[in-house]
């Protein structure tokens, strides 16, 4: 494909030690030759690929020196975009990088759209669409675990699994077309049995990938963990203790937290989305009532609940009412304020929690917090919450395409078992291929491709 030459600032626009202005396209070398004065006189267009050159960026019209720089020259096809790429490594900050970018645009480059460098890598065949999405996941990764999964996707783990399934489907199509062209009754019966078995295998393969979508959501968005309890049991104090900073207001006045507070914390590599909720109780105060309603909505969506109880007080009607709405949830009972004289009835608590997980903590004295973090980690990796370290995870877009592909493959299985003609069976197989192609990009629409790359930042 032939594209124009694009340019953008690829680094953070604020104050920094280094800034990078990136160019990609057929005119990248010509443009840099006009504005770059190497320390040792040389034709920058003729230097070896993947080399670094010291010099200055100079306005060719005014001869004003813009900055002292290092210029990276990377020639096609062995580059990120499979086009000629130039990266100008200059001093950081808004002024210098903006002036250099302006000069580059003046020489004929166009300002890149969000994600356009990676989009060109996809359109030029260097990566598939799932790998392009992995670039976004790497940029947005909140923990090393999230980064590790994204890196697996970037090197093609998802694409390779999809290719395996597509190859199997293509094999089935070849067999079916052969049966259509050369029908022999004895051979046909044997072939249809083999085709049926392979079709069922593909359904199982798709199911395995679909099952990993929940892990993918947790890794990308964080384990939704709601901190709940009646007012003034220490929910906000627990949030602050886990964050190791004062994010929520802590007072002795019940009902202080009116809004839902969301923060991310890294618990042993797992991204945890902590949600501090308003204390759940009956109230006539309008604003607090809205907060309680929001808290109940959060409960319905949470992957894990930290139910905070006050060890220095007896269980109350409010505690029991909260217990009643927690059926079917992953719960850790957090017994707070153990630094104070204990008044809670432990036998009553154990009966109520049905031998659930109880962790004793003091957010004031920082007791039990590490045990709580270990418990969350163990819940995740022993399988109580859907996440395994060894699986390939997919995103919601992949899941939708896989669900559709599975539907067509199941229809294919039914058609084979029902003795339908080979022509009808191939329709379902081709439809399944089309859905799988949406994941890696071969059959993705232009609108879908644009939508994905619009999520990128400019310069990537």
From Swiss-Prot:
Annotated binding of (6S)-5-formyl-5,6,7,8-tetrahydrofolate, by residue: 22, 87, 126, 460
Keyword ATP-binding found: no
EC class: hydrolase
Residues engaged in binding Mg(2+): 236, 257
Cofactor(s) of this protein: K(+)
Biological function: Exhibits a very high intrinsic GTPase hydrolysis rate. Involved in the addition of a carboxymethylaminomethyl (cmnm) group at the wobble position (U34) of certain tRNAs, forming tRNA-cmnm(5)s(2)U34.
EC numbers: 3.6.-.-
Name of the protein in question: tRNA modification GTPase MnmE
Origin species: Thermoanaerobacter pseudethanolicus (strain ATCC 33223 / 39E)
Binding site for K(+): 232, 251, 253, 256
NCBIfam families associated with the record: mnmE_trmE_thdF, PRK05291.1-3, small_GTP
Main location group: cytoplasm
A GO CC annotation given for this chain: cytosol
